[in-house]
Structures are given as C-alpha cells and as structure tokens.
Amino acid sequence: MELSSNLKDLYIEWLQELVDGLTPKQEQLKIAYEKAKRNLQNAEGSFYYPTDLKKVKGIGNTIIKRLDTKLRNYCKIHHISPVEAPSLTQTSSTRPPKRTTTALRSIVNSCENDKNEAPEEKGTKKRKTRKYIPKKRSGGYAILLSLLELNAIPRGVSKEQIIEVAGKYSDHCMTPNFSTKEFYGAWSSIAALKKHSLVLEEGRPKRYSLTEEGVELTKSLKTADGISFPKENEEPNEYSVTRNESSEFTANLTDLRGEYGKEEEPCDINNTSFMLDITFQDLSTPQRLQNNVFKNDRLNSQTNISSHKLEEVSDDQTVPDSALKAKSTIKRRRYNGVSYELWCSGDFEVFPIIDHREIKSQSDREFFSRAFERKGMKSEIRQLALGDIIWVAKNKNTGLQCVLNTIVERKRLDDLALSIRDNRFMEQKNRLEKSGCEHKYYLIEETMSGNIGNMNEALKTALWVILVYYKFSMIRTCNSDETVEKIHALHTVISHHYSQKDLIVIFPSDLKSKDDYKKVLLQFRREFERKGGIECCHNLECFQELMGKGDLKTVGELTIHVLMLVKGISLEKAVAIQEIFPTLNKILMAYKTCSSEEEAKLLMFNVLGDAPGAKKITKSLSEKIYDAFGKL
C-alpha cells in the first residue's frame, strides 16, 4: 500500500481531530486550528509532505510538526514506509528574505554565516548586533555633540549645561513643554547613550561625560556632518564650565576674608529674623513695608563693610583691573572637601521660580507669571522638585543659579484638607524641613473648589503644629489676586535683603541623601555665616535633583514607605515603628523571635500600644502588620 500523491483530505481530517481534542478552556487554540482547516480546504494544489502546508495561510511550524507526527503514526499503522520530508530548518532557510532586509545585506549576512558557522549549526544563526548610532538631529545626537563641545571628557558637566548647548543640534525640544502637553523632551535619549556605554553618569548631583567610545563616535559624527564649534580654537576662559579641582584650595571664612582683604564683620543679630518679622505684618501696605526695609538698611549700613573691593591679589595670579569684580565671582574654593564659590552682592539678580503646576484655573495656566510681569517683576516657570515658589539668585557672569533661603508652599483650603487626609501634608512638611531653607511659608488661599467636610478641627490643628512646633510662617490670602500682591511684597523684601549680602554657593559632588544635603548646608552656615554679611546656599541643580520625591531614599525612608502600604499606618505610626525597628530586616527578625503566633500578633501593640496621639498602635492594626510581615 502506498500513499496518495495528494494528502490534503488526510490533513483536513487530522486538523479536525486536533480541534475535537481541545478542552473548552483552549478557545484561542481552537480558533487557530479551525482557521488553518478552513484555509486548507480553500487552498488549491496538491499537498504531499507536511512542509508543503507552509504556503497555506494560518499554518505554521507548530501545526506542521503535529501533522507530521500524525502522518508517521498513520504510516506505521498501515505498514507504509515513512515519508522522508525535508526539515523545517532547511525549508525556512530557502524562503525569500523579508521586505525589511535589502538584497545586499542578505548577501553579506549569508557570507558571514558561511565563514563563522559550521555546517551543522547553520540552522541556529545568531543575530548580529548593530552598532548604535543616533539619528541626525535627534536627542542623542545633540547630547553627544554638546558634551564634546563642552569638553566633558576629563570631568563631567551638568544636565542644565548640556541642555543649554544641545538645543542647536536637535530638531526637538530638550525639555518638556507642559503648556503644549509635551511631557517628554529629547533629553530622554540619555538613557540609550548610557545603555550603549557612550556616556558616563556619576556623582550626586549627576555629572555626564563621554567615554572613549563616545568620544570616537562623536568626533566621527562631527566630521561627517561638517560641524565646527564656536570656540573650538580658543583657549578656555575664566567662565569655562569644566573646572580643574587641583586648582581649588581649601579656604575657611578667615582665609576667604584674608584673600579678599576683608575685615571681620560684626554679626547682625536682627538680620536673621528680619524677613520673618516682615511676614507677619501687613505686606499689602507699601509704605509700612518701605519703612521697615530702609530702617533695616540703615542698621546694616552701620555694621556691614563693602564686599566689592579686592585689595590683595596673590603673586601667582594676574587679574586685570577691569575684571577684578567679575573674576572674584567665579573663584572656586573648597571647605571640608566640598567646592564653593563666593558671589559678591551686585553680581547676581534675584527672582522667583514658580512651579508649572501652580495655576489659577485650567483655562488660565499662566496667571501668576503674567501678573508678576505686569508689576515689573521677573519670574520663571519650571517644574520644581520641592515647593511651589522658590527664590533663586542668578550670577550675571556665569549664568549659574542657586536656591535662596525662602520657599513657599501654596495651598487652597480644600487642597490642604485633602493633603491632611491622605498624609501628603506631613510628607511635604518633612521634605520642606530637609531643604534647609530658613524661611518656610505656607500660603493659604481661603478659596475652595470642593467641600472640606468635617475637616475644620484637623485644619486648625495642622496649621498650629507647623506654626508653633515646626516654626513655619503662614500667609493668608482671600484669592489668587491677593496672593500675587503678597508674593510681590515678599519679593521686594527678599530683593533688598540680598542686595547687601554676599553668597557662598555650594557645589557638592557626591551627596547620598536629603540628610546629607542639609548637613553640608549647616556646616557651611556655621563657618561662613557667623560674622554676618554672607549667606550660604546650594546651587539650583543640586536642589532639583536631591529634593525630589522618588530619588535617593535611605534605608530608613524605604522602611517607612513600605510600612505605609499597610492600610491604617499613617506617616506618624510608620516613623514611630521605624525608630524602634530601623530596617525591614529588624521587623522580620523580631517576628521570628516570637515564641507563639499570639505573641507575634500583639508585637506592635505591646511596643506602641501606649504611644501618644497618632503614634498609637491598636490590637487590630498590630494584627494587620503581622499579616503583612509576620508570615513571610
């Protein structure tokens, strides 16, 4: 007995058997088999080998293998010599190339495979990895060229410096534009550059530099596209973004004053609390505001000595007379291993930055910036890592910015009530504390877009806590228009305050957490602010990177966040638990040491059952915590 020259009917019959053998749960597989059977019935021509079915739409290698098994069993039962069909790998290798593969690339690939693979391994060809080359005028292309232009090879540069230069090399905006709903900028291409080892990221705040492969590729792109950098053949000037750490020597307050020929300045006792005193007065009364400002001006003029004169220059430095003041603003020194710059008063301008989410309404998103502009007050809008309004100082020579010691958190009454209810209020309060800003304001707008329910007492308690216990200041306004008036009045005070101050701007290179951010700031304040006339602050880039919600969590912060995932655990309860059990491992070990399940369920209750106020743990909550951690 021999097989027919056309086994189409047998294949259709076996496909039906495959359909009948499926369970009700294999609905998708049933649809695939029925589709294959239907297409085979409508197909023209003869089908002898199972591999001949490959040309039928809906029949792939899996179905062919199952039909091949059935054909072999059929031949065995009927004592027919088995069909020697060509292998699937040989069949697939003879198929025409895909549309996306050019004929030239197919020839090259086949030649390489013939050279590198043994004959028996031709069926398992390895896909060759292509070298990553960013598309012309793309984000990655612009970042590479800007890094090369900034000479970011021996030392890295910041994200802001890259973005400032990269715009001319890209067809896309490097930063998000929230007003046009462009939530992602071309800067996101940095991830691909790091993945392919073209750019190196290091330090906190982050610094970016080119690797050897990155330098080679970028120079090739520059040559291929005929790009020339503006100052390619010039010597690096005094404002060069890449600085040599070896030229930075250690200088404390005494050394700094000796270098600039300054005398020891008496401490201005009233100067620290001046801004806080102004806050609680009627800021909407210009005459009263001016009287206080110029009264403070007279006090300062009697005690402070001008910081603009540079009387002595070391022998190894040659500074032109016309550039004395500008040169002094960019000298970088070190204290406790941290770099800093001295900005003399008059060498920087002060203005507020408003968070892009601070709007009057959905239809009037730029209300505050336009209102400040009408009052002749410069402002910027960008995404802030912390706070709704911060004041910055921008160096007129270098363009670098630093965060001043004033931050405002704006809340409507209904938003404040919601933030208390979902624990955002305490979380924001803690982050504001870690910012190190001396003047922290809660600006409360007494307008509501919703009902606050039974939150009156909670609102009073929360506001009293931040005013009395945490020493925050509060500004109350009736609406957005009055908010503009109060912010403008506060800006007047801040601008005058810093018109007679020199700034020590800190440039740390390796901060691990928000606690380190504040620790470094306090160290500088203890050294440089003890004689008055100088104020210390971090650069804006450092503030933006370290004060965000999601980055640089310590083990303790992670423990608190995990504990708050248990329903019923507020921030206060989580902090109380973390003080006793510093890490999650300590919690797990505490449950393992319990002698019985009943003891484990009451572990947290026995520890914090008598804790005061919001830190108290009830028996039911203690059992919930056991269910989450005690059964692991």
UniProtKB/Swiss-Prot annotation:
GO cellular component, as recorded = Holliday junction resolvase complex; nucleus
Keyword Transferase in the entry? The reply is no
Describe its partners and assembly state. Interacts with MMS4 and RAD54.
User: Which residues are annotated as active site?
Assistant: D415
Residue ranges of every copy of the ERCC4 domain listed in the record: 351-448
Q: What is its main location?
A: nucleus
| The protein's Enzyme Commission number | 3.1.22.-
Quote one Gene Ontology molecular function term: metal ion binding
Organism for this UniProt entry? Saccharomyces cerevisiae (strain ATCC 204508 / S288c) (Baker's yeast)
Interaction with MMS4: region residues: 527-632
Does the UniProt entry include the keyword Magnesium?
A: yes
Q: Which UniProt keywords apply?
A: DNA damage, DNA recombination, DNA repair, Endonuclease, Hydrolase, Magnesium, Manganese, Meiosis, Metal-binding, Nuclease, Nucleus
Please state what the protein is called.
Answer: Crossover junction endonuclease MUS81
What the protein does comes down to:
Interacts with MMS4 to form a DNA structure-specific endonuclease with substrate preference for branched DNA structures with a 5'-end at the branch nick. Typical substrates include 3'-flap structures, D-loops, replication forks with regressed leading strands and nicked Holliday junctions. Cleavage probably occurs approximately half a helical turn upstream of the free 5'-end in these structures.
- Recorded effect of pH on activity: Optimum pH is 8.0 for the cleavage of a 3'-flap structure.
- Where is it located? Nucleus
Q: Where is this region: Disordered?
A: 109-129
Question: SMART domains, alphabetically?
Answer: ERCC4
Gene Ontology annotations of biological process type: DNA catabolic process; DNA damage response; DNA topological change; double-strand break repair via break-induced replication; mitotic intra-S DNA damage checkpoint signaling; reciprocal meiotic recombination; resolution of meiotic recombination intermediates
Reported cofactor(s)? Mg(2+); Mn(2+)
The further comment given in this record reads: Two distinct classes of meiotic crossovers have been demonstrated in budding yeast. Class I crossovers exhibit crossover interference and require MSH4 and MSH5 for their resolution, while class II crossovers exhibit no crossover interference and require MUS81 and MMS4. While class I crossovers represent the majority of crossovers in S.cerevisiae, they are virtually absent in S.pombe, which lacks orthologs of MSH4 and MSH5.
Compositionally biased intervals (Basic and acidic residues): 112-123
Matching entries from Pfam families are given as:
EME1-MUS81_C (PF21292), ERCC4 (PF02732), MUS81-like_WH (PF21136)
To which protein family does this belong? Belongs to the XPF family.
